[in-house]
């Protein structure tokens, strides 16, 4: 059975909130769904806007969409819209690694796809490589209900 994207996003937000709270952050939710961010975090000194994203492990890296897609709307002004200048962090949950990664937007100035390396690249490239372990704030294993029942 194919999972509804909203359900997948809710599971990601839950994993992120658990990891943030365990890491010592205060977590608040904005009212409504018309903000460009999903959460607000409080580190005791300042507040920051966080966009939650589901990452997928592909070719040794956790990859996520670093933009919103509007192509499914009737007459979108733009098919994609990035988050640069509108959030402070991406919080990425990857079910395959159970990792939650908090990535400052200035470390992910990308318009479409974000990426964190889980394994070093085979060509030994070091420049412009972001290692997942440097951004990991916790591990949370949240499986879909049908996976828990079947397993």
Predicted ranges, named:
Residues 1-35, 41-151:
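Mixed-charge (Asp/Glu-Lys/Arg
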């Amino acid at each position: 059975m194919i999972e509804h994207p909203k359900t997948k996003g809710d599971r990601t937000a839950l994993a992120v909130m658990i990891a943030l709270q365990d890491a010592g952050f205060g977590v608040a939710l904005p009212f409504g769904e018309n903000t460009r961010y999903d959460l607000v975090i409080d580190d005791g000194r300042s507040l920051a806007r966080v966009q939650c994203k589901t990452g997928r492990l592909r070719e040794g890296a956790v990859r996520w969409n670093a933009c919103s897609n509007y192509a499914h709307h009737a007459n979108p002004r733009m098919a994609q819209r990035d988050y640069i200048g509108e959030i402070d962090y991406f919080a990425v949950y990857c079910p395959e690694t159970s990792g939650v990664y908090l990535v400052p937007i200035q470390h992910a100035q990308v318009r479409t796809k974000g990426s964190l390396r889980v394994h070093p690249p085979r060509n030994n490239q070091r420049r412009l490589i972001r290692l997942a372990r440097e951004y990991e704030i916790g591990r949370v294993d949240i499986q879909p209900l049908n996976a828990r029942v079947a397993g």
